[in-house]
């Protein structure tokens, strides 16, 4: 996070500024405020983007559940962020590990400059960062695909955000946080968002267990257009995710947008080339996976690295994330949607490469006049140690606490993580939500006969219980046949995940 203002309104009372006697707008640049508001909307659109991305990758029977959980993350974390999340993460007081409850219920956040970015008021920075907090559990919860109950997922979102995301974000972005004081670089969330969600997804996959037919069935994306749509939403929103992390309308934010676009583009190309070399055909899903890998990898360094470095980071991010998709076979974990590979490994790669390619002249684009050091390319070699400390500590903390939380939840009545085997076969959409992503018109209706005179005749029919039973039986057989045909077609055409 970056800031570029000298104005410091004095808070008074519980509002953080008396708007009845002081024009609080005078302390902030309207352009900065407009850009962060726009970035907030851009980051919001990423959350349904995650839902569509996961919905397309998941099975047809779990498509709606992925969309449902992504939107529930928005609502649940919005309340958590208002209740105490923002205060725990960005309060002006606190030790090196967690903030205070001084801003509980958004007290003293009206006109006071944020601790995370003094260029904007607390209330604006709160809603912007609230979108970061909301998307992180949405990323992690995809690990429940095809077998996770909805209610425990929602409880997990609230608790995990409070005890995992908030502390890691505090360490990283709050001036009192120990990683911030150490000097680690994380412009937009390599550790708080991607490493933490990737490790949480790995923990969820381990605790919830494998899908019932894991190892006997090749899983295929059920809806490639949904994957593409989700990627478009993510790519579009990521401009605000990284660009808005400048916390001001300045050249550093512009550079963050430029390197974000480059890394995504190169990541998509490299993943496609790897897919083609391996399978001898191009893959739309592969391009989308690669673009997301590039976006994840560039996130921590987006406000630190020059454009040429973004090309390298996007390419290496795609290579390492692609290789990481095979880790789940080695460690025998059913990471259904490759969340650990994309976000956990991608975030780690981005953190390390930021130490190598950070440039002091890119940091100076915010115009704040702060003394900058850069990374290896500017001979600041200790930065690699700082980035390693950041990466290891955040990954270990997220994984350990997520495992403990999920283990305890799984033994609490009503919070068991997994549906029964029978319900898993029927699908989460039907069992947990009572809805389906796709409704097919039954093919039992026969067209009316046409006579030689061209007149159509229809015969009246009498419905009774016997005919209804036959119709229901025929409908069930028809649906089963469509399911088999769909699976065969998917296995023949779509790339494996």
From Swiss-Prot:
Bilayer-crossing residues are 33-53, 64-84, 123-143, 151-171, 188-208, 224-244, 254-274, 282-302, 304-324, 339-359, 395-415
Major subcellular site: membrane
What single Pfam family name could you report for this chain, choosing any that match?
Ammonium_transp
Q: Where in the cell is it found?
A: Membrane
Query: Per UniProt, which keywords does this protein have?
Result: Ammonia transport, Membrane, Transmembrane, Transmembrane helix, Transport
**Ranges per topology, Cytoplasmic:** 54-63, 144-150, 209-223, 275-281, 325-338, 416-497
Instruction: Pull the Extracellular topological domain ranges from the record.
Output: 1-32, 85-122, 172-187, 245-253, 303, 360-394
Where is the sequence biased in composition, kind Polar residues? Answer: 451-466
Query: What GO biological process term is on the record, naming one?
Result: ammonium transmembrane transport
Keyword Disulfide bond attributed: no
Q: Which GO terms describe its molecular function?
A: ammonium channel activity
Family recorded in the similarity comment = Belongs to the ammonia transporter channel (TC 1.A.11.2) family.
Its name, as the record gives it, is Ammonium transporter 1
């Amino acid at each position: 996070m970056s800031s570029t203002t000298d104005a410091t309104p004095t808070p008074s009372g519980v509002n953080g500024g008396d708007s009845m006697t002081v024009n609080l707008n005078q302390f902030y640049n309207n352009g900065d405020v407009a850009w962060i508001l726009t970035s907030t909307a851009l980051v919001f659109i990423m959350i349904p983007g995650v839902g569509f991305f996961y919905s397309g990758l998941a099975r047809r029977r779990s498509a709606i559940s992925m969309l449902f959980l992504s939107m529930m993350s928005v609502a649940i974390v919005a309340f958590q962020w208002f209740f105490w999340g923002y205060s725990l993460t960005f309060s002006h007081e606190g030790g090196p590990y967690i903030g205070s409850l001084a801003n509980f219920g958004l007290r003293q956040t009206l006109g006071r400059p944020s601790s995370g970015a003094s260029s904007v008021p607390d209330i604006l920075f709160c809603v912007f960062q609230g979108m970061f907090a909301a998307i992180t559990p949405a990323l992690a919860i995809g690990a429940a695909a095809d077998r996770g109950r909805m209610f425990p997922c929602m409880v997990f979102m609230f608790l995990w955000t409070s005890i995992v995301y908030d502390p890691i974000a505090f360490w990283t972005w709050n001036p009192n946080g120990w990683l911030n004081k150490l000097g680690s670089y994380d412009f937009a969330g390599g550790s708080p968002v991607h490493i933490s969600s990737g490790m949480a997804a790995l923990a969820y996959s381990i605790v919830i267990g494998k899908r019932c037919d894991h190892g006997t069935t090749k899983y295929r994306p059920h809806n490639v257009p949904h994957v593409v749509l989700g990627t478009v939403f993510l790519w579009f929103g990521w401009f605000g995710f990284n660009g808005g992390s400048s916390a001001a309308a300045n050249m550093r934010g512009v550079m963050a947008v430029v390197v974000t676009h480059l890394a995504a583009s190169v990541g998509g190309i490299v993943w496609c080339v790897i897919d083609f070399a391996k399978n001898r055909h191009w893959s739309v899903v592969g391009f989308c996976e690669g673009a997301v890998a590039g976006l994840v990898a560039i996130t921590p360094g987006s406000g630190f690295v020059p454009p040429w470095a973004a090309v390298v980071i996007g390419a290496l991010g795609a290579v390492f994330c692609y290789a990481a998709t095979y880790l789940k076979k080695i460690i025998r974990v059913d990471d259904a949607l490759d969340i650990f590979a994309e976000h956990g490994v991608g975030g780690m790669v981005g953190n390390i490469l930021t130490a190598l390619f950070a440039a002091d002249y890119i940091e100076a684009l915010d115009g704040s006049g702060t003394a900058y050091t850069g990374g290896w390319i500017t001979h600041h070699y200790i930065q690699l140690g700082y980035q390693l400390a950041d990466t290891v500590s955040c990954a270990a903390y997220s994984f350990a606490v997520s495992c403990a939380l999920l283990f305890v939840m799984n033994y609490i009545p009503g919070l068991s993580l997994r549906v029964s085997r029978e319900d898993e076969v029927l699908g989460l959409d039907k069992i947990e939500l009572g809805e389906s992503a796709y409704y097919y018109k039954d093919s039992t209706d026969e067209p009316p006969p046409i006579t030689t005179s061209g007149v159509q005749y229809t015969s009246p029919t009498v419905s009774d219980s016997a005919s209804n039973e036959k119709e229901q039986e025929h409908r069930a057989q028809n649906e089963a046949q469509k399911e088999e045909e769909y699976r065969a077609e998917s296995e023949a055409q779509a790339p494996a995940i």
